[in-house]
C-alpha cells in the first residue's frame, strides 16, 4: 500500500514497445489506432514492457444501432468485448512469464488533436479506481513524420477526475473547485529504454571519420566545387535556407482557426443561455411582485392568501449547458498554439535573415 501511495513521476518505455506502437499507428493512419500497454510500477516509475492492439468491431452500414460509436477505434479501450479480450491477452502473457500488469492504453493522434471526449472517457475508464496507476500514451503520427518522435504520456488530474465523476461542470461548480483547462491532464516525462545488448551493439557501430578542417573557399565557384558539396553528408544543407512555409505549420494554423471558431460558438451558446435565464428571472420577479400585491389586497379583505411559491410550477428556468466541451476546446487551442510556437522558431530566423528585402524602405546591408 505504501508503494501505491507514491505518485507516478515518470514513464519508461521499452524501445520495442515504441516500435510496435509506431507501426500500428502508421498502418491505420489517418484513422485512430488504440491498444493496451502492460508493464509494472517500480518506485513511482511506470515501466512499459509490452503492448498489443485492440481489435475494432466494424458496424455494418445497414446497422440501425443508435448507440453505435461514431469512431469505433477511438472507443475500443472501454468496449465490453475488448475488456474481455484484454484480460485474455494478459492471462496468456503471464503464462509465458511476461510482465502482464495492465498499466494503461495508447492511441494515435494527428496534428496533436487528442484532446477530445473519447480520450477523456477512455482514461477515466482506466483511472476511475482508487490509486489506479495507468497512463495514456499519445503517439502523434504527423509530428513524428517530420523527423522527431512524438510520444507523450498523460493522466487525468485528481481535480478533474472528481469533477468528471460527479459531472459538475457548471460555472458555479468550476468557480468553487478552481478547475481550469490547464488542469485536465497531468503530463509525465517519457524515457525510452534499450536493453544492454542493443546499447552495446550501437556503441560498436562504426562512426564516420571526421574530416580535417579545411580553409574557407575564396569564391562561389570554389565553394561549389569543394568536397562538402559532393559529399553525401547532411550538413551543410542549403535546403534549410528555403523560405517556403512548412505545410505542417500551415495545417496547424488551419486547425487552430477551426478550434477558435468552435470556441466562439460555445461562447455564443452560453451567452444565449444567460440571456434566456435573465428573461425568465425578470418574468418570475414580475409575477412574484404581482402575487405580493394580490395577497396584500386579499389580506386587507380578510381573504385566504395565495401561495407565493407557485412560480416554480408556472415557470421553468433554462438548463445551464455543460462547460466541459468548452474546457476541452480551450485545452486543444492551447495544444495547437504550443505546436505552432515550436514550429515558427526556424521560419522566424529565416525571415529576419532577409529582413532588408521584406520591409519597405530598408535594404540589406
Swiss-Prot record:
Subunit organization: Component of the eukaryotic translation initiation factor 3 (eIF-3) complex.
Alphabetic keyword roster: Cytoplasm, Initiation factor, Protein biosynthesis
Source species: Aspergillus fumigatus (strain ATCC MYA-4609 / CBS 101355 / FGSC A1100 / Af293)
Top-level taxon of origin: Eukaryota
Alphabetized CDD domains for the sequence: MPN_eIF3h (cd08065)
Swiss-Prot/TrEMBL GO biological process terms: formation of cytoplasmic translation initiation complex; translational initiation
Stored InterPro entries: eIF3h (IPR027524), eIF3h_C (IPR045810), JAMM/MPN+_dom (IPR000555), JAMM_MPN+_peptidase_M67A (IPR050242), MPN (IPR037518)
This protein's name: Eukaryotic translation initiation factor 3 subunit H
Amino acid at each position: 500500500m505504501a508503494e501505491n501511495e507514491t505518485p507516478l513521476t515518470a514513464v519508461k518505455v521499452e524501445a520495442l514497445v515504441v516500435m510496435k506502437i509506431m507501426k500500428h499507428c502508421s498502418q491505420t493512419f489517418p484513422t485512430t489506432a488504440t491498444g493496451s500497454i502492460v508493464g509494472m510500477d517500480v518506485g513511482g516509475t511506470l515501466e512499459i514492457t509490452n503492448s498489443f492492439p485492440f481489435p475494432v468491431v466494424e458496424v455494418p452500414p445497414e446497422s440501425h444501432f443508435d448507440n453505435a460509436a461514431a469512431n469505433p477505434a477511438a472507443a475500443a479501450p472501454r468496449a465490453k468485448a475488448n475488456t474481455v479480450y484484454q484480460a485474455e491477452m494478459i492471462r496468456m502473457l503471464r503464462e509465458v512469464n511476461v510482465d502482464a500488469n495492465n498499466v494503461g492504453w495508447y492511441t494515435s493522434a494527428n496534428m496533436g488533436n487528442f484532446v477530445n471526449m473519447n480520450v477523456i472517457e477512455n482514461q477515466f475508464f482506466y483511472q476511475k479506481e482508487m490509486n489506479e496507476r495507468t497512463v495514456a500514451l499519445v503517439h502523434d503520427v504527423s509530428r513524428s513524420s517530420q523527423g522527431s518522435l512524438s510520444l507523450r504520456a498523460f493522466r487525468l488530474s485528481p481535480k478533474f477526475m472528481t469533477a468528471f465523476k460527479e459531472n459538475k461542470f457548471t460555472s458555479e461548480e468550476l468557480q468553487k473547485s478552481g478547475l481550469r483547462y490547464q488542469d485536465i491532464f497531468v503530463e509525465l516525462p517519457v524515457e525510452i529504454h534499450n536493453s544492454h545488448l542493443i546499447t552495446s551493439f550501437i556503441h560498436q557501430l562504426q562512426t564516420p571519420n571526421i574530416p580535417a578542417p579545411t580553409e574557407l573557399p575564396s569564391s562561389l565557384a570554389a565553394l561549389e566545387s569543394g568536397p562538402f558539396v559532393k559529399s553525401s553528408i547532411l550538413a551543410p544543407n542549403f535546403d534549410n535556407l528555403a523560405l517556403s512555409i512548412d505545410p505542417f505549420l500551415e495545417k496547424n494554423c488551419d486547425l487552430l482557426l477551426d478550434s477558435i471558431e468552435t470556441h466562439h460558438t460555445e461562447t455564443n451558446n452560453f451567452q444565449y443561455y444567460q440571456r434566456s435565464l435573465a428573461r425568465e428571472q425578470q418574468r418570475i420577479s414580475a409575477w412574484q411582485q404581482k402575487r405580493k400585491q394580490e395577497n396584500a389586497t386579499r389580506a386587507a379583505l380578510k381573504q385566504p392568501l395565495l401561495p407565493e411559491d407557485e412560480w416554480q410550477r408556472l415557470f421553468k428556468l433554462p438548463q445551464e449547458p455543460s462547460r466541459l466541451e468548452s474546457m476541452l476546446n480551450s485545452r486543444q487551442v492551447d495544444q495547437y498554439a504550443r505546436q505552432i510556437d515550436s514550429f515558427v522558431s526556424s521560419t522566424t530566423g529565416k525571415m529576419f535573415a532577409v529582413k532588408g528585402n521584406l520591409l519597405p524602405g530598408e535594404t540589406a546591408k
